């Protein structure tokens, strides 16, 4: 049996401020730092270890992974970073307060932008200061590859390309893998692994910094999955609450 651990980054400063974040490189809040330490402690107490780790090129996911591995005394584990594991790009919504955006465009429209799988928010323009094509972390991207906005289908496409080329082969070789990423990135992976319908993924929420374990067969098909707490596996349908750590 193969085990894969997925973890969404701890609470970010813009999660705290209820802003659309996307590819904006926002750091963890103090609460997010605590959540990451707690996740590491949970994994350590439950006897987990890792051979290789994957994350995005955004600091909230990178720092969460660093803290988790530090808490587990696994700081030496190789870490691979890729923009393909970045959060969904929210286009011109990035940086905007979600409640204020709902007041401007209507709650129904904002809900469609956030939760539908194939509707993109308004795009950035290339002269927008939030357009980060020239950021050195994206130097390998061609101009047409850098998104100006994304729907979940767009996010899923790049995430699964990286899954099939980089992560799945490591799992099949017997490596113990952890992925520290973002809400919509993990939603994309869960949709693929569990073969969820479009309706099924709309209601799927991924909590911050709670380890989600997938037990997979030799073909990487899910046997079962569950969240972890200090007391071990959490019953299906339940999500453990964070403790102060």
UniProtKB/Swiss-Prot annotation:
Pfam families: His_Phos_1. It is an enzyme of class 5 (isomerase). Its EC number is 5.4.2.11. Keywords: Gluconeogenesis, Glycolysis, Isomerase. Belongs to the phosphoglycerate mutase family. BPG-dependent PGAM subfamily. The record marks 182 as: Transition state stabilizer. The active site is at residues 9, 87. It comes from Bacillus thuringiensis subsp. konkukian (strain 97-27). This is 2,3-bisphosphoglycerate-dependent phosphoglycerate mutase. One of its GO terms (molecular function) is phosphoglycerate mutase activity. GO terms for biological process: gluconeogenesis; glycolytic process. Catalyzes the interconversion of 2-phosphoglycerate and 3-phosphoglycerate. CDD domains: HP_PGM_like. Pathway: Carbohydrate degradation; glycolysis; pyruvate from D-glyceraldehyde 3-phosphate: step 3/5. It catalyses: (2R)-2-phosphoglycerate = (2R)-3-phosphoglycerate. Substrate binds at residues 8-15, 21-22, 60, 87-90, 98, 114-115, 183-184. The gene is gpmA. Coiled coil: none annotated.
